[in-house]
């Protein structure tokens, strides 16, 4: 079945196929022209046509893949977070404020952090740093009004940098993750003459859920036990420094799927907070850590790729449960802090890539001896008469030669006699017949052409079974794997390990869909393959059709026309976790805004060149060219090439060194 522009296929059909209205969160939709729209402020009247944008960038000689960063989405996510907490604070009459501190580790790119610091400063938000490089960046980019929370393991130099910033009047809070860090803080504070402001991270009994549940609980990597926390507070009080402990921090996971875990954690942490106040700590802040989820699959569930709550519900629970515990204890409400990096950054980045080609899996071409009036039969039965129950009229077709082995004849009989009523029996018989053919072939008793005929007949049966099964209300378990088995592999110009590492490492789902041709009905079940030389470089789990699917519906490729796909919600962790597998480097990155309905390209960050990625692994251009020159001179001396060809060879290598690491799809 080909993909055609059909009035029966609508924009609504495309939206349901790719679930864009479920995971798009108001930022992504489909236009009347069948292209993907991006609405950074969730205002449909202020939208960017993704296909038009990519075409414009192509006119600037910017090849795909390209990572598009929409600054407006970053700003909108920060404002929405602020609005939700302000609503909760107002509704519950909470007597303090809220701040988000963005963990730089989520997306360390300077342009991204600058956008967040700029918008965050207006809202009173801050930065979380988990290493010395991140702290240096945070202090340099922020001002005195930007709070900086320092997490992670720390050495003397890390702590000295933090306390020196405190001495400058900066609001920097080093958080004690293990007991020895408090010793360092006290020593450095005494050395530089600062009365330190300190936070402590506690290990809660409450654990998160899903793949990040190990971030919380007694066995978590970071934090102090409650016993250690109290012992260190007693130590500070004995030194007349109880007022220095001002922040309590906990963390139950990077993505909290079930709101119940958050409620339990807040209640537990709030109880600890009020007890610290009673014991003499100068508490001011309750840092609830990360975990505010992102609904990658649009299911609004507690699955690992979703969340069963809204941002407003999250804010309400944090405020309400903290307030309730503090009011019961007669303790002032703390200033609330969250480290909601994933929720802020995920939506703003979109990776666009071009399809390079397709490999069909389980080709259903029938053997050459199956003909109708001299023409080979196609697997969709075009031009073939069917009887009243759907079987093929065999009088028009030739069967296998008599010399062919019996299992091949069995496959042929099953194919031509298959109906809705006997399709399961035929399918099972076909599996047995194919196994017999493979055994005969391995034993040297089945010629290669008969093996090809058997495989073609088997896949033709599978295609026909899948076609007949589409009318069934409930597909039998034996047939549920057919879409996956018969799916095409669409090869796209990207590296999974560079641009979507979480898809490979932890089976993270990311929405993927074409950015154009969405008014055409897609007809191909597909999985995606990248261009690395690694069998793991594939995507075979997708957000579509109302849930997680093993294949993605795509359109047949058209000769001479590009077919472009986008991966959405890759703004959190993917860029910084990406690696140089096969030396595919960073993609081009483009920062985009919209003003009065006009798309503005704010900046273009060119992707890595071949020379740059070779430099990362200690190769030098000069040395490589010198080595090549030696080979060229040897080839000239041996008469393999002339001087003109030598110049062409060296020039080609020099061009390659300055070129993009990804494949070129431009025609020369």
UniProtKB/Swiss-Prot annotation:
Query: Which HAMAP family does the record associate with it?
Result: SpeA
Q: What class of enzyme is it?
A: lyase
Name the Pfam families for this protein: Arg_decarb_HB, Arg_decarbox_C, Orn_Arg_deC_N
| Species the sequence originates in | Rhodopirellula baltica (strain DSM 10527 / NCIMB 13988 / SH1)
| GO terms of biological process kind | arginine catabolic process; spermidine biosynthetic process
Q: What is this protein called?
A: Biosynthetic arginine decarboxylase
Catalytic reaction annotation: L-arginine + H(+) = agmatine + CO2
* Positions carrying N6-(pyridoxal phosphate)lysine: 105
> Annotated Gene Ontology MF terms?
arginine decarboxylase activity; metal ion binding
Q: Where does substrate bind?
A: 286-296
